[in-house]
Amino acid sequence: MSTRQLCRRSFLYGIAVFVLGTVSMSGSVRAQEVLKIGVLGVMSGPAASWGLVNKYCAETSAQLYNEQGGFEIGGKKYKIEIVPIDDKNDPKLAVSGAERLTKQEGVHYIIGPNVDTTAASVQPVAEAGGAIYFPYAFQKTLYTPPHGNAVLGMIASYQAGPIIYKYLMDKKGVKSVSFVARNESDPLNQRDEGVQAAKKLGLEIKSSDDTYEPGTTDFFPVMSRVVNKGADLIVLSGVAPADAPLLIKTARELDFKGTLATETAQDIKILNEVAGAAADGFICVGGASTPEIRSDEMEKFADRYKKVAGEWNDEAGTKVYALEIILATLKKAGPEAITNIELFKKTMPDFAMKNPFIKGDKMLKYVGTAYFSQPRQIGVPMVVNEVSDSKFQTLFVGSVE
């Protein structure tokens, strides 16, 4: 063999080794499988903080797991990829978003949507596409047989409402109540549930038919009617974070001296910026993580959340739970459940883990059977807050079984 042939063979061999090495290296880089989790919700407009907190929570948890090499399911670590979509609180956009997640992205687990109308609109898409979704909406039919693909991600208004009303009756002597709601199905449903609960407790209903249209900025006409009814308590049913401070401020400017409350979560920054001192005494459902009960893991999450979102939002204490329980349930169900949600569903009734976000040994599990005839709710702590000196102060902590 000539020297030229020898050199040529050595050169070709070198190329082959390089190519094989490159393929091997790139193969090892690609070896880690990706687990996609969708986040579908309202991320713009008056209710934007509801969906954005879902997104930031999922991204925060994903970062923390991915920095440790991923989340282990069946002996294999998966990189967590969050796929967020803004549905703008529009049922049509929610449907197209759910279709994109299930059909194009191959997602089988979705966090959101945030209200009844969008959650109901994606139900057929989730069921047809083999997806489990975790809405923050309270319509009972979403979670009740024959449906089984939706899991309530928070405390519902009809669970928190009666407890808040009873507390105010016992602690503040409240005897009468008026309700005001935005003229949309979600707030109207919450109002109706609240009226029923108030009646059962023996509260006098001063009024419950006053509503305002989406996009309202002048609340004096509607709140004048409500305040003039003379109730001890005004409930802002299903109020969006951008509307709440305007309603509160208007009520106080109309010289309302009683208590204002809602069964939904709110944003203290928006309350302070718009309502200011008028928000003092306002009662709402809080995030499921008060400073008194936070574990070290929750503190770590909160620190990272601030870097991801720019600031802490009290509601993140509730919405941290969605991705955590999805991953933990998949771990127990096995890797096949990543694409087969029926295995996930079979695991849910007996699933239990130590709650990683609160001190002590309290277990985290799926609850809600008393309301939905099946366990289709994350068992997050129920925290009720009162605004005091521009901060949320915890009134009490409860739970739903």
Mark where each language-model region is.
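Extracytosolic ligand-binding ectodomains
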Residues: 2, 7, 11-15, 21, ...
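N-terminal signal peptide c-region/cleavage motif recognized by signal peptidases
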Residues: 24-26
